[in-house]
């Protein structure tokens, strides 16, 4: 499963079969009012629905494991980890920057991650909401309160 698709509903995919089916139903009800992105999403969700029906599970995008374009199998969790490109608005350049920078040195803060990988504030906010950055502090600076 690679990133030949351009639209993903990562939340629905992670929640599984029932949520994917529900989302497909919502899109199909719209029929003629679908955007190009929503039309692409239908195909992606149909594949995801089939995969979940066969026992596959989707995980979350993972800062330390995700590939730029390909889904990765997480043997421990028995899930497919989505690539960075599955995040709406995140392009090839940023996805590749994340991989390169991650291999070079561990990220110690969101601030440092954003600078090193050249990620926009909008994408940082999306990644926060998706829980991708949950293990990183905002800043690299130490606070007196952190030392207590």
What residues fall within each predicted segment?
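Noncatalytic, beta-rich nucleic-acid-contacting surfaces in large DNA/RNA-processing enzymes
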Residues: 1-148
